Regions:
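Catalytic loop of short-chain dehydrogenase/reductase
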Residues: 7, 19, 45, 49-76, ...
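Conserved NAD(P)H cofactor-binding loop of Rossmann-fold oxidoreductase domains
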Residues: 4-11
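Hydrophobic structural elements of the Rossmann-like NAD(P)H-binding subdomain
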Residues: 2, 53, 95-98, 108
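A short, exposed helix-loop element centered on a Lys and neighboring polar residues
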Residues: 37-38, 82
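Catalytic tyrosine of NAD(P)H-dependent dehydrogenase/reductases that use a Tyr as the general acid/base
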Residues: 25, 34, 70
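Substrate-binding pocket helix/loop in short-chain dehydrogenase/reductase
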Residues: 12-14, 21-23
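C-terminal helical subdomain
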Residues: 90-93, 97-98, 105, 113-159
Length: 159
């Protein structure tokens, strides 16, 4: 199972966030993923190697100014996935978050409109790594996997 939906929302001071926008970002980035875990848990438990992988962001840790709602939801997502991983530790389920780093996406273009998109990797460059992480014969690392070296074509856990 892969949870990849995300909503950036407006980059604005926390005190300027509209309640409706806050609710939408929270609903998309956190609540939808919790619902996915809740709905898929029986199937993951029935699997010989259930995998629950969610996409996070470095802002879960760096928490830059004006990124309040997005940063809060990604930090909360990492927390809930860590808790779920602990709760399922004695089962075949493995849950983790992946921070792919800067990727050429619509969301990134909205956050960094002056950035040349060709200076960041295409989103599909992460696919081989994600597939490797969810292989049934692999024991994925615990917690959030973050990529420091984006010069690689296919990132690896050992990087």
């Amino acid at each position: 199972m892969v949870g990849a939906a995300g909503l950036l929302g407006p980059l604005t001071p926390v005190s300027h966030l509209e309640p409706k926008g806050w609710d939408m970002i929270l609903s998309t980035n956190l609540t939808a993923n919790w619902r996915l875990i809740r709905a898929m848990d029986p199937l993951l438990r029935a699997s010989d190697a259930g995998r629950a992988l969610f996409f996070s962001s470095s802002v879960a840790k760096t928490r830059p100014a004006f990124w309040g709602a997005y940063a809060a939801t990604k930090a909360a997502l990492e927390a809930i996935v860590d808790v779920y991983a602990d709760e399922t530790e004695k089962t075949p389920i493995r849950a983790l978050c992946v921070d792919p780093g800067a990727m050429r996406t619509r969301m990134r273009a909205g956050a960094f409109p002056g950035e040349d998109p060709q200076t960041v990797p295409a989103a599909e460059t992460i696919v081989p790594f994600v597939i490797d992480l969810v292989r049934p014969d692999r024991e994925p690392p615990k917690g959030a996997v973050r990529f420091k070296d984006r010069g690689q074509e296919s990132p690896s856990i050992d990087a």
